[in-house]
């Protein structure tokens, strides 16, 4: 069993890359459902199932109401035990390896306490994978959000 859902990570980024940006955030609910996410009734907030269960996805918008940056807590183990905290690092390493295999060398990376690795695609989007002490987070910048990267 793939506890980190590496294939799901790659598949999600690929699906986000392929969306017909720009998409207005107030019209994103049907697209979210196609991604397997559930609208919450609040614009820009969705729920989805990831490697460590159901998580909340948040999306910011630009001045034109277009979706700009998605924040997705992809791996967040429950509990405070040191073993579970170590899982966040293992998940990050697994996702980076899968990303390098799928998309090649990242264009930006920092490896330290809060490590991150980012890939930029010809569609003018960025997938930024971030490892915090206790979880792994994916920040996806649409063409409308890329200027804030």
Describe the residue ranges of each PLM region:
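Short helix/turn-capping signatures at newly exposed starts of structured segments
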Residues: 1-113, 122-126, 130-149
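Short hydrophobic/aromatic beta-strand element in the GNAT-like acyltransferase core
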Residues: 116
């Amino acid at each position: 069993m793939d506890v980190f859902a590496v294939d799901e990570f790659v598949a999600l980024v690929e699906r986000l890359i392929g969306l017909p940006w720009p998409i207005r955030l107030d019209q994103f609910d049907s697209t979210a459902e196609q991604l397997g996410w559930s609208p919450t009734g609040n614009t820009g907030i969705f729920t989805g199932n990831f490697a460590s269960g159901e998580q909340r996805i948040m999306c910011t918008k630009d001045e034109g109401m277009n979706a700009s940056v998605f924040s997705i807590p992809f791996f967040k183990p429950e509990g405070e035990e040191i073993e579970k905290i170590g899982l966040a690092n293992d998940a990050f390493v697994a996702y980076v390896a899968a990303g390098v295999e799928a998309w090649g060398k990242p264009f930006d990376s920092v490896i330290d306490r809060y490590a991150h690795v980012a890939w930029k695609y010809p569609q003018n989007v960025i997938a930024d994978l971030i490892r915090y002490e206790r979880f792994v987070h994916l920040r996806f910048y649409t063409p409308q959000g890329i200027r804030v990267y």
